């Protein structure tokens, strides 16, 4: 048997749902999708869900992760085994851990390939900081996976599809996560997974102010802007959602233009599937040039304005 009888899907990020649903179609006979509202439910059915389970009734001061109890109960009530697919977001990984505990299931994070053999999931993901690919065969009846962006193609919606909708009512967990405060952050409205052209900046850009040079190039060629992990996590120059690498975005654009990025393996894992890689770096020995199809050795601050002017003609 090369499929599960049932797969359960949940995405806290709507843009990741089409990819997860496409993977679900390949891995199971019946697709169940947990959603938070009616609009997401309608989208899930168009993407192939046979059953939609609307999570309802959570108090405003509680976290989505506290739906884990009722989600696990619902999964158990509809089969003695199954596959759970979640995005490899922070919330996805936290929810995966909670579901794994409640289902007595093995959990595998950041999956880059998934297959089913004899009713058991086989999962591949990066290990040793991206230096190798590990393969795991999950033996537990339930398997909980968080999926790296780009692992599956994106499912296409079909308005003619139909499915059944159910409501799953909130039940307060024995130990709850209570939200005590919220802090607004800059939202990322760009879906980098779908970008044809990507300009990505590293610390070699020099300063937060110099990122404007990359933004001007993006505008000239119709590209989207991304970054390396240090730019987002260490320097805080850009939002977390834009960094490319093993623990976040895995992109497959037609062009990936790396500006001031050294090219460590942890970053290149997220960019190496690009059709063409173009690198700009003042260090001629930077590892990025081993991956690049084209490269310029020089100061990005001087090269970017000239490149923008040439391409804007």
Swiss-Prot record:
Q: Where does FAD bind?
A: 255-283
Gene3D superfamilies per the UniProt record, alphabetical: HUPs, TPP-binding domain
Would the keyword Flavoprotein turn up in this protein's UniProt record?
Answer: yes
Pathway, according to UniProt? Amine and polyamine metabolism; carnitine metabolism
Per the record, the domain of life is Bacteria
Q: Name one GO biological process term.
A: fatty acid beta-oxidation using acyl-CoA dehydrogenase
Tell me the GO molecular function terms.
Answer: electron transfer activity; flavin adenine dinucleotide binding
Name the keywords, alphabetized. Electron transport, FAD, Flavoprotein, Transport
What InterPro entries does UniProt report for this protein, alphabetically? DHS-like_NAD/FAD-binding_dom, ETF_a/b_N, ETF_a/FixB, ETF_asu_C, ETF_asu_C_CS, FixB, Rossmann-like_a/b/a_fold
Q: Which SMART domains match?
A: ETF
Outline what the protein does: Required for anaerobic carnitine reduction. May bring reductant to CaiA.
Similarity annotation: Belongs to the ETF alpha-subunit/FixB family.
Q: Quote the subunit structure annotation.
A: Heterodimer of FixA and FixB.
Q: Which NCBIfam families match?
A: PRK03363.1
UniProt name for this protein:
Protein FixB
* Source organism of the structure: Escherichia coli O6:H1 (strain CFT073 / ATCC 700928 / UPEC)
